[in-house]
């Protein structure tokens, strides 16, 4: 296709390539004039009038995936993309939404999804925008980008970003396939195993010092090293004058980074540091000595784009990465850190050079503000510099303009900062972790994701710690621990230990595009009537149910995590309304014609068999919620509990003999066990536990047909305790070698 724009003196040539599973559109822009032209905003695909785009039956109920790097969600096409706390009533107004990199719409009535994405992002940040009006329908849809005031010479032809269009019945599968296309196109080779790191930020912030780091490393070596802890990362606070642009140590690190890296190396750890390499503080001599290295706007150069939040405050500028001398400065400074033994780099505030206001630059034939070319150039310089010194170094890309570091850095920050426990609101946590749910498809495709730092210690509640830990584990990405290990209470240690080592693969948010019914039940009405008493449904967005499959050599099962994000609603100021999830078995990928055993990890409660007629009572009262499983019919699994909380169900197929249904050691409820077997002749269930030395816990078994049961742990008699719903519990303490255990059934 050829599009000629006579008034602009330009031409766009588009080639459509029909692949087996998608359409690819490659585009070229040509300046037809005898003068240089400025390329600003550009649309590659666009509808120009009402009715030109339609997303199927009852399209107002269609669900739209939108991505903003650190944020992400799936919403109704007819619902505002703003958080519920900010949204205003949208009755007759037009709703506008946008998404970077890719956009998707799914119609649950037609069971059809359409994905539009950018296959390349070398110079520009591709965006998809859509408008909807309840009365008029889709008011507009386009794919394009801010071209960043790129100078195009007379007669010059410029390659634009490639886009793809995909359709399919499974919206999540389309996202995964899109991620695979990105991975192959850009030669991304994700790490096989996600790293485990410790970060100084939340326990210490600017007060961090050498001794803090070494004290935490010593405890980490004792309790976490065998579970994968490898990187000890010093966040903002080590730099001279606390400047984000300083590469020299302050007095809190009197021996310097090189000495610290050597001390950590003796413990088997790598030193990591935080750095904001594209940020220059007004207090840094560079700002005064080399203003030409900094980006400007249409009024001034350099132009500050933000006021630094922490000491010493002040204005900050973005490095002009189109300037050769600024590039050399970046090479020199990053190399200096690698030469000091730094092997892990948390690179933050990487979005400055992309700021749409900062278009005034040294080389106008490289896109800076408004695009990603200059930032990608800077990321390439960093990657090449660091790997020329240490090919094994790791880099975490912290940039809401996600494409800037794709293909250069292995680790991908995938949500907003989590904050210390207790301080952030449940609403923020819900929106932030739903963003993680939206981004799980990126793991092992665009890189290894990191859902920000993991804090499990006080002052927040134990339930909050469990929510954070569950998200960190089921994300399947890097786990970055950010608690003071020298003061962490033992109850929080149990939370932390239970999610290590990392899963290595992500869960699937099965309700993201098709939210399940979430009900509220009335305490007073159930007490009075003896029947179920619904107080209405909660219209929830998806991202509350994450499912992960666990495969071992002795069994396979699924982990189902249910997130109730909100505090209980009240009615008439007298009662809390409890939350009930109504989950179709089909959503979990399970066959309701089969029988399953269900175990909840955080409460260590065996919930019994499901589906089960015994869970259905003619008389219902509020105390029934203590069973957690409210009902389990052939169609639906009903789980009831008060939020904010998380429940993690391990669901296995029922056996015709005794079998393990859960443990207290690891969130997988059995992934830490090996060689589990049942000997029918000897009536013996046995296996091995593999955990760090000294961890106290238990395993849970069911299917016991005799009253007399004996157990041994490490060939010594062990206690047998009766648990919930006919289960038995065998306490044990892990040892250096695999801990062997046996459960023997004696004849009556």
Regions found by a protein language model. Give the residues of each.
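Beta-strand-rich recognition/accessory modules
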Residues: 19, 44-45, 83-194, 459
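Surface-exposed beta-strand/loop patches in extracellular or lumenal glycoproteins
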Residues: 38-47, 566-592, 690-706
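An acidic-aromatic substrate-binding cleft motif
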Residues: 175-231, 235-240
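Active-site-proximal substrate-binding groove within the catalytic cores of carbohydrate-active enzymes
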Residues: 156-157, 371-651
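Non-catalytic C-terminal accessory domains or segments of carbohydrate-active enzymes
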Residues: 532, 557, 561, 618-748
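Polysaccharide-binding surfaces and accessory modules of carbohydrate-active proteins
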Residues: 1-130, 594
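Aromatic- and carboxylate-enriched substrate-binding clefts and catalytic-loop regions
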Residues: 226-460, 464, 492
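Solvent-exposed beta-hairpin/edge-strand motifs
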Residues: 47-59, 585-604, 702-715
């Amino acid at each position: 296709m050829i599009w000629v724009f006579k008034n602009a003196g330009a031409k766009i040539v588009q080639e459509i390539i029909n692949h087996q599973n998608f359409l690819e559109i490659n585009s070229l822009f040509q300046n037809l004039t005898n003068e240089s032209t400025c390329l600003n905003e550009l649309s590659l695909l666009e509808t120009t009038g009402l009715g030109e785009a339609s997303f199927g039956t009852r399209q107002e109920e269609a669900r739209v995936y939108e991505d903003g790097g650190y944020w992400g969600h799936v919403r109704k096409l007819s619902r505002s993309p703003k958080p519920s706390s900010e949204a205003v009533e949208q009755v007759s107004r037009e709703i506008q939404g946008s998404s970077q990199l890719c956009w998707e719409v799914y119609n649950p009535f037609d069971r059809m999804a359409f994905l539009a994405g950018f296959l390349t992002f070398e110079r520009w940040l591709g965006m998809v925008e859509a408008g909807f009006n309840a009365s008029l329908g889709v008011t507009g849809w386009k794919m394009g980008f801010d071209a960043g005031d790129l100078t195009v010479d007379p007669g010059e032809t410029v390659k634009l970003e490639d886009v793809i269009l995909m359709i399919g019945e499974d919206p999540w599968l389309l996202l995964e396939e899109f991620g695979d296309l990105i991975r192959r196109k850009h030669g991304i080779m994700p790490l096989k195993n996600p790293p485990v790191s410790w970060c100084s930020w939340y326990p210490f912030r600017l007060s961090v010092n050498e001794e803090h780091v070494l004290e935490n490393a010593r405890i980490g070596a004792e309790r976490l090293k065998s579970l994968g802890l490898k990187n000890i990362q010093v966040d903002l606070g080590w730099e001279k004058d606390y400047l984000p642009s300083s590469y020299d140590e302050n007095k809190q690190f009197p021996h310097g980074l090189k000495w610290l890296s050597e001390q950590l190396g003796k413990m088997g750890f790598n030193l990591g540091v935080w750095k904001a390499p594209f940020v220059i503080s007004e207090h840094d001599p560079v700002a005064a000595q080399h203003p030409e290295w900094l980006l400007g706007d249409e009024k001034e150069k350099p132009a500050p784009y933000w006021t630094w939040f922490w000491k010493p405050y002040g204005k900050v500028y973005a490095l002009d990465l189109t300037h050769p001398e600024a590039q050399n400065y970046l090479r020199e400074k990053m190399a200096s850190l690698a030469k000091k033994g730094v092997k892990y780099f948390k690179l933050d505030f990487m979005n400055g050079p992309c700021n749409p206001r900062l278009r005034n630059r040294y080389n106008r034939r490289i896109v800076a503000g408004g695009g990603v070319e200059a930032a990608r150039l800077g990321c390439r310089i960093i990657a090449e510099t660091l790997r020329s010194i240490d090919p094994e170094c790791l880099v975490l890309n912290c940039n809401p303009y996600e494409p800037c570091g794709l293909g250069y850095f292995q680790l991908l920050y995938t949500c907003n900062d989590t904050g210390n426990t207790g301080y952030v609101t449940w609403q923020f946590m819900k929106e932030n972790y739903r963003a993680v749910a939206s981004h799980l498809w990126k793991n092992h495709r665009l890189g290894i994701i990191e859902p920000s730092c993991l804090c499990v210690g006080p002052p927040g509640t134990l339930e909050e710690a469990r929510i954070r830990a569950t998200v960190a584990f089921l994300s399947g990405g890097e786990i970055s621990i950010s608690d003071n290990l020298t003061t962490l209470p033992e109850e929080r240690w149990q939370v932390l230990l239970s999610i290590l080592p990392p899963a290595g693969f992500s869960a699937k948010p099965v309700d993201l595009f098709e939210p399940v019914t979430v009900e509220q039940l009335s305490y007073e009405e159930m007490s009075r009537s003896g029947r179920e008493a619904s107080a209405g449904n909660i219209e929830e967005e998806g991202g509350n149910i994450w499912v992960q499959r666990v495969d071992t050599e002795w069994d396979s099962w699924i982990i189902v995590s249910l997130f109730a994000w909100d505090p209980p609603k009240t009615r008439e100021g007298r009662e809390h309304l409890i939350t009930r999830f109504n989950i179709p078995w089909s959503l979990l990928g399970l066959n309701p014609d089969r029988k399953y055993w269900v175990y909840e990890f955080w409460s260590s409660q065996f919930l019994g068999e499901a589906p089960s007629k015994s869970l259905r009572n003619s008389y219902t009262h509020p105390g029934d919620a203590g069973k957690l499983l409210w009902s389990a019919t052939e169609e639906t699994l009903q789980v009831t509990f008060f939020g904010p909380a998380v429940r993690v169900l391990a669901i296995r197929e029922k056996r015709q003999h005794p079998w393990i249904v859960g443990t207290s050691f690891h969130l997988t409820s059995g992934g830490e066990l090996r060689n589990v077997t049942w000997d029918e002749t000897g009536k013996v269930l046995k296996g091995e536990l593999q955990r760090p030395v000294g961890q106290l816990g238990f395993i849970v078994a069911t299917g016991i047909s005799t009253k007399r049961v004996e157990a041994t742990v490490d060939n010594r008699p062990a206690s047998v305790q009766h648990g919930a719903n006919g289960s038995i519990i065998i306490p044990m303490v892990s040892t250096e070698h695999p801990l062997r255990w046996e459960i023997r059934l004696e004849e009556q």
